[in-house]
Curated annotation (Swiss-Prot):
Residues 292-312 are annotated as: Disordered. It comes from the Bacteria. This is Elongation factor G. It is found in: Cytoplasm. It comes from Coxiella burnetii (strain CbuG_Q212). Keywords: Cytoplasm, Elongation factor, GTP-binding, Nucleotide-binding, Protein biosynthesis. InterPro entries: EFG_II, EFG_III, EFG_III/V, EFG_IV, EFG_V, EFG_V-like, EFTu-like_2, G_TR_CS. Residues 10-292 form the tr-type G domain. GO terms for cellular component: cytoplasm. Belongs to the TRAFAC class translation factor GTPase superfamily. Classic translation factor GTPase family. EF-G/EF-2 subfamily. PANTHER family: RIBOSOME-RELEASING FACTOR 2, MITOCHONDRIAL, TRANSLATION ELONGATION FACTOR G-RELATED. GO terms for biological process: ribosome disassembly. Catalyzes the GTP-dependent ribosomal translocation step during translation elongation. During this step, the ribosome changes from the pre-translocational (PRE) to the post-translocational (POST) state as the newly formed A-site-bound peptidyl-tRNA and P-site-bound deacylated tRNA move to the P and E sites, respectively. Catalyzes the coordinated movement of the two tRNA molecules, the mRNA and conformational changes in the ribosome. NCBIfam families: EF-G, PRK12740.1-3, PRK12740.1-5, small_GTP.
Length: 699
């Protein structure tokens, strides 16, 4: 049996705070750290000192880039709970960093979605919400900034329902709004809560519900109780009998339905004004899952069968690395989430994806950017290890006697690339090291050398993503670099099926070369990727040469068909061929495979694909005509329009190639008043005139 734990697993919460850029997520996290007694002076993003935003660029830009993991403890607003441990993973809200969000969601058990009471559900919230649905993460909603002009709690609740297709259940109502926002009504306790300004909301008073709100409170309280009662027949019977449920029963019913992802309890407040975050912490304990409430994590056992690890100290150790960060003091930090078992510093672990064994040096628990060294971590913990050499994001680390590979994370392909060159000879060597480290930290960032031009090319998820990489290179590694113009990551594919022979024969003195294959090349659904099938019967091409044929095809796919861009979404089947006892070799079959693909693909109606971005522009009405006209000029397809307090919202799909420098153009079109967000949506066929121009340029 494992030794006793300081805090039982069912009193642990691993949560993320997700939000749109300006919903106030960082301030909310800050307040959480303040009330849980970790940070003594509250950081404000406006002053650029927030505890969670520990990379310099974040402090300058006021947006959160890296998900730092922080541990804190909470006993409840009235000290009504035994001690709970809450691990918070901060997730970025900016669209170029959806990869970070994806990583955090992967290791969370629950999440708090922060919405701005004025802006409501913004496009970024929708993206993150969809990601959270994919990982089945139970969530709470917190409508923040209730003190701002234009604040409207119920409008946001309706947007959560309409835009996110969720089932929001308010468990609080605000008392007043804008500058009259005074506190909240706790619908479960039927009391008004007013936090004391004097001690920054550390204490509060309970009072009766204001007269003018009683009818409204009654209406929303009934909705909440009905939602709780639907969790079980037993509660429903009790509710139908008595017409009410006790606070314990309400919480029990709401918890059950939140964990099942059937409802989203909604709270409100103003983190900046120190109101409501304390009750939000209580809700995290009341409604979000502990590691024992979520299904056991699945994976692949060493023998290839499906396995799982449940959250317990007694199971073999298994953890998932979800973030790598370079730290100026200790070197590489690997953040990981422990799913099962116990790990002590000094233990050896196995990385099944790389097939390597490593020894764990120091173990650290983070509080934003200060750290505490710990001796061991247990199931459900989130910590960082120092000095792991081979582990990259998404890798499993586990006990060597009980090997399991936890499901890998999927990372999106980069859509934009730029050439980068060092300014001086001295920067040359440092640049390679710096880019290597940054690529290890961030799987959505890639580096390669262009064979023809010998330039170093960096690829990423958007202009901002690459700007920040170049910026970090300058600050953290002192490398000055010149950056070329951004280039779009086009792809190629085919539209019809063909069958093609590839025959490679060289009869020179001594041993010759002989490889002969017939390939069927077929288009696949967009996004389906590459598939290679061996349909050879009767051994007309021996088994050992098949991988060489596939390799030849893959290499040729990288070189493109017409424009030199990678080929995607094709299925290649080898169905016929011949070989020579003496002269056949892997080399010959690789060349034959590559010849057949090159020849065949060029007859299969090849087309050029370009990345299409989902763009949402928010603009004051008076600039609407100019903004839409400009988007049409950029080959934009308008998908819809909507109203919001911030102005008109235009949803549009635009080719990435037309979006370079858009930020500057939009600023001048709207005198700086319009804003936009952009994320990758899909690859689509480029119109023939555009494709021809690109092919010409490439050749």
């Amino acid at each position: 049996m494992a030794t006793a734990r300081e805090i039982p697993l069912n009193r642990t919460r691993n949560i993320g705070i997700m939000a749109h850029i300006d919903a106030g997520k960082t301030t909310t996290t800050e307040r959480v750290l303040y009330y849980t007694g970790v940070s003594h002076k509250m950081g404000e993003v406006h002053e650029g000192s927030a505890v969670m935003d520990w990379m310099e660029q974040e402090q300058e830009r006021g947006i959160t880039i890296t998900s730092a993991a922080t541990t804190c403890y909470w006993l409840g607003m009235d000290q009504q709970y035994p001690k709970h441990r809450i691990n918070i993973i901060d997730t970025p809200g900016h669209v170029d960093f959806t990869i970070e969000v994806e990583r955090s969601l992967r290791v969370l058990d629950g999440a708090v979605a922060v919405f701005c009471s004025v802006g409501g559900v913004e496009p970024q919230s929708e993206t993150v919400w969809r990601q959270a649905n994919r990982y089945h993460v139970p969530r709470l909603g917190f409508v923040n900034k209730m003190d701002r002009a234009g604040a409207n709690f119920l409008r946001v609740v309706n947007q959560v329902k309409d835009r996110l297709n969720a089932n929001p259940i308010p468990i609080q109502l605000p008392i007043g709004a804008e500058e009259d926002f005074k506190g909240v009504i706790d619908l479960i306790r039927k009391k008004a809560i007013y936090w004391n300004e004097a001690d920054r909301g550390r204490t509060y008073e309970l009072a009766d519900i204001p007269e003018d709100m009683k009818a409204e409170v009654q209406k929303w309280r009934e909705k909440m109780i009905e939602a709780a009662a639907e969790s079980s027949e037993e509660l429903m019977d009790r509710y139908l009998e008595a017409g009410d449920l006790s606070p314990e029963q309400i919480r029990q019913g709401l918890r059950q339905r939140t964990l099942a992802n059937e409802i989203v309890p909604i709270l409100c407040g103003s983190a900046f004004k120190n109101k409501g975050v304390q009750a939000l912490l209580d809700a995290v304990i009341d409604y979000l899952p502990s590691p024992t409430d979520v299904p056991a994590i699945r994976g692949e056992e060493d023998d290839g069968s499906e396995g799982s690890r449940s959250a317990s100290d007694d199971e073999p150790f298994a953890a998932l690395a979800f973030k790598i960060a370079s730290d100026p003091f200790v070197g590489t930090l690997t953040f990981f989430r422990v799913y099962s078992g116990i790990l002590k510093s000094g233990d050896s672990v196995y990385n099944p994806i790389k097939g390597k064994k490593e020894r764990i040096g120091r173990l650290l628990q983070m509080h934003s950017n200060s750290r505490e060294e710990i001796k061991e971590v247990r199931a459900g913990d989130i910590a960082a290890a120092v000095g792991l050499k081979t582990v990259t994001t998404g890798d499993t680390i586990c006990n060597q006697q009980n090997i399991i590979t936890l499901e890998k994370m999927d990372f999106p392909e980069p859509v934009i690339s730029v050439a980068i060159e060092p300014k001086t000879k001295a920067d040359q060597e440092k640049m390679g090291v710096a880019l290597g480290k940054l690529a290890q930290e961030d799987p959505s960032f890639r580096v390669h050398t262009d064979e023809e031009s010998a330039q170093t090319i960096i690829e990423g998820m958007g202009e901002l993503h690459l700007e920040i990489i170049v910026d970090r290179m300058r600050r953290e590694f002192n490398v000055e670099a010149n950056v070329g113009k951004p280039r779009v990551a086009y792809r190629e594919t085919i539209r019809r099926s063909v069958e093609q022979q590839g025959k490679y024969i060289r009869q020179t003195g001594g041993r010759g070369q002989y490889g002969d294959v017939w390939l069927r090349i077929e288009p696949r659904e967009p996004g389906a990727g590459f598939e290679f099938e061996n349909a050879i019967v009767g051994g007309v091409v021996p088994r050992e040469y098949i991988p060489a044929v596939e390799k030849g095809v893959r290499e040729q796919m990288e070189n493109g068909i017409r424009a030199g861009y990678p080929v995607v979404d094709v299925k290649v089947t080898i169905f016929e061929g011949s070989y020579h006892d003496v002269d056949s070799s892997e080399m010959a079959f690789k060349i034959a495979g590559s010849m057949a693909f090159k020849e065949g693909a060029s007859k299969a109606d090849p087309v050029l694909l370009e990345p299409i971005m989902k763009v949402e522009v928010v603009t004051p009405e008076e600039y609407m005509g100019d903004v839409v006209g400009d988007l049409n000029r950029r080959r934009g397809m308008i998908q819809g329009m909507d109203e919001s307090p911030a102005g008109k919202i235009v949803d549009v799909e635009v080719p990435l190639a037309e979006m370079f420098g858009y930020a500057t153009d939009l600023r001048s079109l709207s005198q700086g008043r319009a804003t936009y967000t952009m994320e990758f949506l899909k690859y689509a066929e480029a119109p023939s005139n555009i494709a021809e121009a690109i092919i010409k340029q490439q050749s």
